[in-house]
């Protein structure tokens, strides 16, 4: 497969044999079926149930069992979802057991028991019902990161709530992510699109007499959305709502300078901030180098080095450095939710009210990320060329390959000399041409 990139160089992709070897190496990345949110009839003895209230700026999906898509919705929507988690004897804390086929088996898989769409009044009523069952009346709001479909966010949050064992009312705020590694720009703008909505959700929760305390947990790009929403609230109202006591910033994909500005604008009465960082976070390295951000990412700083050490101490920000923590995540971007020890720590801190990836990525997606270089378009095109044979083998890559092509095509636009023949890449790669 020869790819002309208009830069005077040719490049030949590995053939199917190498692709098969790589696919075997990352076999755990095999895709999962669409439609996992279609409810199953019943669960099994020993399984756990997690009830999640959802507020979303996503557009309703056209396909049954998906509920909401990666497109932007015209207004804030609400849902109430119950997830069944298989018995502890068949799963390790920190993991999500995705069904390989539908319907999923509640004895071994995460499955959906109920998925109701609600209006705002119904959502308020169900919040009241859930807080009545929780003695502490504490709400945990989770805001996911980049490259998350709706079902990714739902099942990951269910895993976090279950594994932390925290007695909280779970509220998921999910924004329109397309669930594609090449839709970074779209996802970033979707967080900006969702700022007012998240601010409104947090304000209404804080004004609800049934709620005593709110903790916000953000991951990756979701941190930008959380910081911007809290910053807006402080500017509008003079301070962040007092019931928002704790904000956990896990692997924040946020420029350090912008984070400083948000901390300052939140004022001295801001919530307690806890920061999870890791210097080996490869996803944040990609964010910095490929997508045009030259500044340091907050989630990848060394908290023991200056000027960060002094700044964090001065701002009274608690830091947990996860660099040495082991993770099954090849990108080291979801350590906060994937390590049993860290999940237990987070649960204890939430229970005590103290300060303290995740997304599924296929083999082809990983190659796209790993080929990233100084020239984003060239790196992306090369990554897709390598990914082409893998897309025939690895289900997750095959599922997202077409989305990658569309996103790349939009990014190339009128770029002169871009002569990548993407439409026939998989067939040509398998034939060795």
Where are these regions (language model features)?
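The conserved beta1-alpha1 loop
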Residues: 141-145, 251
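Short substrate-entry loop that stabilizes the transition state in hydrolases
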Residues: 149-153
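C-terminal motif of bacterial Sec signal peptides marking the signal peptidase cleavage site
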Residues: 25-28
């Amino acid at each position: 497969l020869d790819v002309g990139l208009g830069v005077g160089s040719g490049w030949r992709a590995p053939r199917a044999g190498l692709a098969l070897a790589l696919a075997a190496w990352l076999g755990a990345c095999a895709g999962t079926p669409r439609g996992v949110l279609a409810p199953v009839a019943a669960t099994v003895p020993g399984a756990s149930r997690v009830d999640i209230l959802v507020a979303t700026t996503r557009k309703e999906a056209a396909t049954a069992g998906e509920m909401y898509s990666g497109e932007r919705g015209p207004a804030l929507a609400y849902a109430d979802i119950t997830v069944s988690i298989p018995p502890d004897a068949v799963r390790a804390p920190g993991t999500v057991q995705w069904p390989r086929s539908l319907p999923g088996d509640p004895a071994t898989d995460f499955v959906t028991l109920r998925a109701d769409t609600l209006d705002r009044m119904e959502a308020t009523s169900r919040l009241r019902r859930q807080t009545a069952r929780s003695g502490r009346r504490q709400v945990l709001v989770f805001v996911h990161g980049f490259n998350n479909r709706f079902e990714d966010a739902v099942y990951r949050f269910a895993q976090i709530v279950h594994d932390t064992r925290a007695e909280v009312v779970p509220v998921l705020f999910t924004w329109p992510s397309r669930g594609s590694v090449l839709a970074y720009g779209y996802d970033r703008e979707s967080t900006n699109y969702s700022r007012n909505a998240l601010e409104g959700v947090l304000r209404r929760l804080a004004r609800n007499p049934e709620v005593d305390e709110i903790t916000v947990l953000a991951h990756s790009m979701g941190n930008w959305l959380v910081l911007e929403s809290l910053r807006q609230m402080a500017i509008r109202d003079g301070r962040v709502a007092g019931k928002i006591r704790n904000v956990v910033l896990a692997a924040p994909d946020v420029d350090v300078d912008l984070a400083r500005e948000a901390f300052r604008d939140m004022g001295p009465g801001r919530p307690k901030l806890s920061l999870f960082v890791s210097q080996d976070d490869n996803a944040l390295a990609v964010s910095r180098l490929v997508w045009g951000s030259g500044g340091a990412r907050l989630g990848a700083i060394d908290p023991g080095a200056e000027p960060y050490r002094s700044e964090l101490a001065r701002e009274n920000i608690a830091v947990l450095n996860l660099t040495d923590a082991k993770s099954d995540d090849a990108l080291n971007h979801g350590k906060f939710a994937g390590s049993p020890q860290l999940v237990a720590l987070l649960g204890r801190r939430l229970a005590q009210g103290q300060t303290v990836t995740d997304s599924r990525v296929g083999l082809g997606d990983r190659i796209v990320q790993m080929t990233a270089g100084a020239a984003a378009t060239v790196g992306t095109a090369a990554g897709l060329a390598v990914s082409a044979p893998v897309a025939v083998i690895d289900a997750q890559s095959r599922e997202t390959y077409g989305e990658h092509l569309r996103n790349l095509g939009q990014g190339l636009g009128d770029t002169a000399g871009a002569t990548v023949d993407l439409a026939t890449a998989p067939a040509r790669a398998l034939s060795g041409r």
